[in-house]
Amino acid sequence: MTKIKNLLSFVTQSRAISHTNPREHILNCLTYGLLVIVALCAGFLLWDLSSSPRDGFFHGKRDSHTLILDLEHIQELAVNPEAEQRARNVNCTFWDCLNIYKCEHDRLKVYIYPLQEFVDEQSDKTATTLSSEYFQILEAVLKSRYYTSNPNEACLFLPSLDLLNQNVFDKHLAGAALASLDFWDRGANHIIFNMLPGGAPSYNTVLDVNTDNAIIFGGGFDSWSYRPGFDVAIPVWSPRLVRQHAHATAQRKFLLVVAQLNILPRFVRTLRELSLAHSEQLLLLGACENLDLTMRCPLSQHHKSLEYPRLLSRGKFCLLGRSLRMGQPDLVEIMSQHCIPVIAVDNYVLPFEDVIDWSLASVRIRENELHSVMQKLKAISSVKIVEMQKQVQWLFSKYFKDLKTVTLTALEVLESRIFPLRARSSRQWNTIDTNARSTFNPLFLPSLAPKSQGFTAVILTYDRVESLFLLIQKLAVVPSLQSILVIWNNQKKSPPHLSTFPSISKPLKIRQTKENKLSNRFYPYPEIETEAILTIDDDIIMLTTDELDFGYEVWREFPDHIVGFPSRIHVWENVTMRWHYESEWTNQISMVLTGAAFHHKYWSHMYTHAMPGDIKDWVDEHMNCEDIAMNFLVANITNNPPIKVTPRKKFKCPECTNTEMLSADLNHMRERSACIDRFSKIYGRMPLRTVEFRADPVLFRDNFPDKLKRYNDIGSL
C-alpha cells in the first residue's frame, strides 16, 4: 500500500501548486482520479494474489511427491456411501468418454493413486486386496516415462485398487471404492486393469463392476463387450510362466499339442477323435490324478506325465480352445515355448489386436470347424511354419515376456490413439528387426512441413562440360533451388574455370575430388547448407522446372524418404534363387535412383560414416550401385519405401551416345543384380519395400486452365 499512499500525496501536491484555468483543472482532476482508481485496483489485485492459495485444477488436491509403494504403510479409507456409482458405459468411444484436453505436450502422463485400502464401515469388509501381479503393474508404471506425481498434469489416472481377478473381491464394494476416489469424475480418463472378468454362472467377458466411463485394460473381451478404439485388450497372465530357452527352429515331434485343462467337453470329444486318427501327430494331454497344475498326463497310455509348460515345445502348433472364460493364461504359456497358437475361440479379441497382426503368428479356426484342424495345419508349408515360430518368439519377447512389458505395451497402445502422429506404424509393431538402427526413425520430423529452406543440387560430373552447363542453366530457374555444388570427379583434368560457367543468380561452387569414386556424390560437404539435397547426374537434362520443384515439395512432406524420378524394382528369381534388378516398367517400384532424387543430408552422413559391411568400398571399387546402396540404407533404417514423382520413365541423354551411358552396358545390369543379392546378404534380410503408387500434382491431367495449375509442365514419359 506504500505505492498507493505516495501516489495520493503526489496528487495532493499537484492540486496545491496548480494555477491553471478551470477547464484544465477539471481535466487534470479526471486524469488524477483515473490514476488513483487504477492504482487501487492493482493494489487489491496484488494483495489478493499474495494472500490466496494457488489452487490447481483439482482445487488444492495437488500432490507432487513421488509415490512410494510401501506395503507396510497402506492408507486405510472408508468407502463413501454417498458416492454416485454408475454402470459401465457400453457406448463409450474415444471421442465421448476421454478428455484429451488433459493430455498436453504430446506425451502421455499417468498419475497413480497412493496405496489405499477401502473399507466398508458397516461390514468391516475390505474392497480389494493387493496381489503381487498388480503390485508389479503399479511398479512398472511408477518407473516408466509415463509416470507423474502431479495429478494436475496427468492425462490418465491409475487406481491402486486391485481388480485383476473378479473372483477375489466384492464387485459392489469395489464399485463404491472406485466412486470414492478423489479424481474419479465418473471414471473419466481412468484406466482399470482386469484379467479375469465375470463369474459363475454367466462368466461375463468384461468386469462386472460399476466403472462408468473408465477405460478397461481387459483380458477377456469378446467382440460384443470390447469397445473398439477405447478399451485395450491385454493377455491373461500366467503365474506358472517360466522363461525357458526354447528354440523357434528346434525339431518338434508333434504337429499339434493340446494341453489346456478347461476346454469345454463338446470340444474335448472332437479332440479325442482326432487323437485316435492322428496319434503320431497330435499329442492330447489332460490333468494328472494328483491335480498338479505343473504336470500334464496323456489321455492315452502311450506317454508318461510331462512337465508343463515345457511340454509345449514338443509341438509346432498348440491349441487354445473354448472354455467358460474367453481369455486364458494358456496363450502366453504357448507363446513362451515358441509354439504357434491355434486359436479355436470365436469372437475372442486377442491381446493388443489393434496393433499386432496375429495372422503372422497364429492360426485362427472357427469352433465348429475344429474337426478339420489337422487337415488345415498339414497344408501349411515347413518354411511358413518356421517363419511363424520366429514371429511368435519375437512377439513374446517384445510384448508378453513379463508383466512390466505387458503394462508398458498397453500404455503405448493407448498413447498411439491419443497422439497418432507419434504412433508406430503397423509394420514397426510387427516386423522382426535384427538391425538396431531400424528400431526408430532418426529424423525428428514435425507434423507439418516447415518453412521451405530450398535444396542444394549436387551434380556429379566427369568430363561432359556441355551437358553440365545446360543442366546448370535449367536448375538455376527452379524457384526452390538455393545453391549448386558441382562435384568434379576427374583427377586427370581440372574443371573449367568458374568464369566459363553459365552466369546464374544462385550460388555455384565447384569441388574437385581426390579420387574418382561414385560415393563422392554422397559425401556431406560443408558447402551443403540445406537439409534437402538433390543428387543429379550431369546428363539428366530432360527434367522440367515444374518437375523438379514439385519433387522438392513432395520431399518436404516426406523428408525421411528418398523422393525422385527414375524408379526400379527388385524381384526374386526362383530358378537362380537370387535377387534380380529389373528396369522394365511394372506396376511396382522399390528403388528410386539417385541420378535424380532428393534425400535428407542425414543420409549422406550415414552413407559416408555408417554404411554396413564393405558395401561402400565395393561400390567404389566396381564403380556401380551407389544408388542401390543408398536405397538399401534408407529402407533398412526407416522401413519406408521410396517415393516416385511424376510419370516420366525415360531418362536418356539426347546428346549422349550409348557407349557414354553407363546404364546401357549389359554387364552393368548384371552387376546391379549382383549388388542387390550381395547387399541383402550383408544386411541379413531384404530391407527394400515395394509400393504401387507415385506422387503427381493434384490437378495433373485435369481438364483445367493451365493458368490455375501450379505445375503445368510436368513433362511426358
From Swiss-Prot:
Keywords: Developmental protein, Disulfide bond, Endoplasmic reticulum, Glycoprotein, Glycosyltransferase, Golgi apparatus, Manganese, Membrane, Metal-binding, Signal-anchor, Transferase, Transmembrane, Transmembrane helix, Wnt signaling pathway. The active site is at D627. Residues 1-25 are cytoplasmic. The keyword Membrane applies. Its main location: endoplasmic reticulum. Its EC number is 2.4.1.224, 2.4.1.225. It is an enzyme of class 2 (transferase). Glycans are attached at N91, N574, N636. This is Exostosin-2. It comes from Drosophila melanogaster (Fruit fly). The gene is sotv.
